[in-house]
Amino acid sequence: MIKIVKKIKFSKNENRMKDFGNIEERLKYFRKGKNKNLYFVLKKRFEWMNGYIQKHDIGLEVGAGPGFSKEFIHNKNLKISDFSDHEHLDYKNIDAHDTKLKNNSFDYVIAAQVLHHIPYPIKFFKEMHRILKKDGKLIIQDASCSIVFQIVTIIMRHE
């Protein structure tokens, strides 16, 4: 069942893709709180992960982009990383295939909407295993790259 939180009407002249890929603008837009549908989608994306995370766990999100996870993950020991160098990141210019982080550093690692961007998945999984502590958790959330998902991405202005 799809729940529409708020129906949005767009003007014919609005360029809905002008900030596509601009992480800083996406983060500002989200923090304004105007798009209730986006909030709903992101809440569903991240909230279920809290059931796998303990209060004092140390976590990392790889490929965090805007870092929306910090809004929904209740654990305050979550660090965010990305291949980019945006100022909101805890770890900048991190290659998920070779993070250069210490062995056994994290109780959990989140990879949300990342796997379809990873060119060498086996190398990625080996690296995640290396940086996770014994019995650590790799929490993966990824959507289908179907045409429907691509259309929804354009409509929501967010991947």
Positions of predicted regions on the chain:
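A short beta-strand submotif of the Rossmann-like class I SAM-dependent methyltransferase core
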Residues: 111-114, 140
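Conserved N-terminal segment of class I S-adenosyl-L-methionine
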Residues: 1-98
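Conserved class I S-adenosyl-L-methionine
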Residues: 139-159
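Short N-terminal helix/helix-N-cap motif within the alpha/beta-hydrolase-1
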Residues: 119-123, 148
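A short glycine-rich, Lys/Arg-flanked "PGG" loop and its adjoining helix->strand segment in the class I
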Residues: 122-137
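A short acidic, Gly/Pro-enriched loop at the edge of an enzyme's catalytic core
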Residues: 97-109
